[in-house]
Amino acid sequence: MTIKEEKYSPNQTIDGMLPKSWFIDEKHRRLLIKGTYEFSKQELINEYLATQITKRLNMAHCPYEVRIWQGKLVSVCENFLKGDQEIITANDIYDLRKKKNYVSDYEHYLEILAAHGLADARNELENMLVLDFLMMNHDRHMKNFGIIRNVKTLEWEKVAPIYDTGQAMNCDKLTKEMNFFEGRGKLFFNTKKKFSTYQKLIHDWSRFDFEKLADLPEEYEAILRQYQAYTQMPDSRIEKQGAGLKWRIANLQSYSQ
């Protein structure tokens, strides 16, 4: 892959803890290349896992690839914004109108999106919640989701595709501390929301065919082994990752029936 560094970022809202930079490849595509900071170096492969889940469940998502660049493991994704688009995050959207006392943060946000003509907002947010449940994503802060706006007309065009799901699958835990049966994530201002409460927010389970994920735990283990030389991840952790993902898929499938 031949790439050159991009001087100007396509969007200044991109931030976070991971080392990252925009580049242009030989096909003139703007690519975001991200590194890792967790000891497990697992965030990058988690992005691949998120891509596989969202693809199989037909969710709008930003696809990620795992690559070796300059001798290091990185994740690569193409810029999902066009030249006349920008992303407005939930962090900036939430305060556009005053929240009613009897309305949850989640419903308040959906009301704002519906008022701007995004009729499919609930389904898109439910997709994100399903993904975060399956992967135990603990870092869905309010700058990690939003909408896409036209910079010329200021029209809200659509809900942004799912992106940035690396902080998941117990990547910050020692192998002996990993727990795939219970955990907590972030949803708006609740930074310790139990994943077990996410299912109650899903209105239409018929949209999800979890049978399409049946062989994914084995595929996830395979790619963890493929890059084992770079992550130094022990076999015991890889096996626990696959078993944990398998349990969470089965748990959600059982709940949805």
Task: Please place each PLM-identified region on the residue numbering.
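A broad, structural surface signal
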Residues: 48-56, 123, 127-131, 243, ...
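Ferredoxin-like alpha/beta domains used as RNA- or RNAP-binding modules
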Residues: 11, 19, 72, 128, ...
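ATP-dependent phospho-/nucleotidyl transfer catalytic cores
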Residues: 79-129, 251-252
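Hydrophobic faces of stable alpha-helices that mediate helix-helix packing
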Residues: 20, 103-106, 217
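C-terminal catalytic region of ATP-dependent kinase domains
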Residues: 36, 55, 152-257
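Conserved ATP-binding subdomain of kinase catalytic cores across diverse folds
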Residues: 1-96
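Conserved kinase catalytic-core segment
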Residues: 105-174
